[in-house]
C-alpha cells in the first residue's frame, strides 16, 4: 500500500490510525519503521505513542529502547541506529520485551537482524520535509487483519 503524506497532519493521522487498529488485536504487534535519516520514522513513532496518552515521548537513539506503559497500552520503541552489533540487543534483554503482549516500534530494523522479531507491518518512509511517501507492507496474518481496519 503506497500513500503520499503531504504534511505533518497526514503523518499524524496515519500513525494514529495504526495505533487505533493495533489495539484491536489481542496479540503483540511488531512494526518496522524503515527509511533514511530525517524521513519521519521517529515522528511517526511519537504520534503513534502519543495516541495512547503519553505526552513526553523521546527518541531512543541513545538508550536503544524506551518503554511506555499505561492501562491502554504497553509499547516498546526501539531505535537500532547506533547498534554496532545486533548482539547488543541481547544485552538489554530484547527477548523479554518481545515476549510481552505489547506493541513494538522498531526503527532501523535491518541493523538488529537476527535479534528482533519478524515484522507484522513494515512502513518504509521516504521523501523530504515538504512531502513524504509511505510504502506499507502487511507481512503476517496479524498484519493483514490490521490492514482491514486501516483501510476501513
Where are these regions (language model features)?
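Hydrophobic anchor at the beta1->P-loop junction of P-loop NTPases
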Residues: 31-33
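N-terminal pre-Walker A segment at the start of P-loop NTPase domains
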Residues: 1-19
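Short beta-strand-centered segment that lines the nucleotide-binding/catalytic pocket of NTP-utilizing
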Residues: 54-69
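Conserved lysine of the Walker
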Residues: 41
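Short phosphate-coordinating micro-motif centered on Lys-Gly-acidic
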Residues: 84-87, 95-152
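Phosphate-binding P-loop
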Residues: 21-28
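The conserved Walker
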Residues: 37
Amino acid at each position: 500500500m503506497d500513500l503520499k503524506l503531504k504534511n505533518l497532519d497526514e503523518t499524524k493521522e496515519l500513525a494514529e490510525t495504526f495505533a487505533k487498529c493495533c489495539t484491536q488485536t489481542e496479540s503483540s504487534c511488531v512494526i518496522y519503521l524503515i527509511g533514511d535519516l530525517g524521513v519521519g520514522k521517529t515522528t511517526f513513532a511519537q504520534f503513534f505513542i502519543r495516541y495512547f496518552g503519553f505526552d513526553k515521548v523521546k527518541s531512543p537513539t541513545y538508550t536503544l529502547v524506551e518503554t511506555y506503559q499505561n492501562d491502554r497500552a504497553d509499547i516498546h520503541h526501539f531505535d537500532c541506529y547506533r547498534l554496532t552489533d545486533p548482539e547488543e540487543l541481547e544485552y538489554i534483554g530484547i527477548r523479554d520485551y518481545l515476549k510481552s503482549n505489547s506493541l513494538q516500534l522498531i526503527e532501523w530494523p535491518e541493523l538488529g537482524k537476527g535479534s528482533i522479531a519478524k515484522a507484522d507491518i513494515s512502513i518504509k518512509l521516504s521523501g523530504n520535509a515538504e512531502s513524504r511517501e509511505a510504502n506499507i507492507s502487511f507481512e503476517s496474518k496479524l498484519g493483514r487483519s490490521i490492514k482491514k481496519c486501516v483501510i476501513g
